[in-house]
Amino acid sequence: MTKISLNKLIAVASIVLTAGCGGSNSQSLNKEEKTSIPPKPPAISLFNASAKGDLDAVKQHIAAGTDLNQLDPNEQGSKDSCLGVAAAFGHKDVAIALIDAGADIGYRNKNGSSPLHIASFLCYPEITQALIDKGADRNARDNNGGTALDVMILPWDQVKGVYDFINGLIYKPLGVPLDYERIKSTRSEIVKILRS
């Protein structure tokens, strides 16, 4: 090959490579963006992922545009939302991800309890604070007429029976019994958050 032919070949190759990396590439990126397929949700339902504390699956559901306000599919269940069940099991990161993604913070289950009622009663300060920071109604009343604060200011001996009931009905059968010491020691912190 002659020196001129080699130079021409290098010049042509440079033009082709430059053209391949130039404006037409950005057009193809735009074309790809327009035709990109949204991510698929994971196999686990959002409700079950929220109940189990599976943050990765919850984030996948959020990215896929899954309805964040799905309810407990169990006909005999409390009809809690994904956020309510995450709060009930103290899955802080899941609850905060759902709150930040726009889950309904004012939803009421069949007992009239909102996620704020649930998080505060079960003494999860970070979830309680995140709900208040997002604008949860502190004055929302459950079906018994109580606000989250009303229940929290009752003496322990008056509410322990309720904890015993839900512990026996829900938590112990699932192998995650309530931590009474954590709850008792955190009640005053929850009251401060609710009053702030």
Roles of regions detected by a PLM:
Residues 39-48, 71-82, 108-114, 141-153:
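Ankyrin-repeat boundary/"N-cap" motif
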Residues 19-20:
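C-terminal motif of bacterial Sec signal peptides marking the signal peptidase cleavage site
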Residues 54-62, 91-100, 124-132, 158-168, ...:
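Ankyrin repeat structural motif
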Residues 2-10:
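Bacterial N-terminal signal peptides that target proteins for export
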Residues 23-32:
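Bacterial Sec signal peptide processing site at the extreme N-terminus
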Residues 48-53, 85-91, 118-124, 151-161, ...:
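Ankyrin repeat A-helix N-terminal signature
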Residues 138-196:
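Ankyrin repeat (ANK) tandem arrays and their immediately adjacent linkers/low-complexity segments
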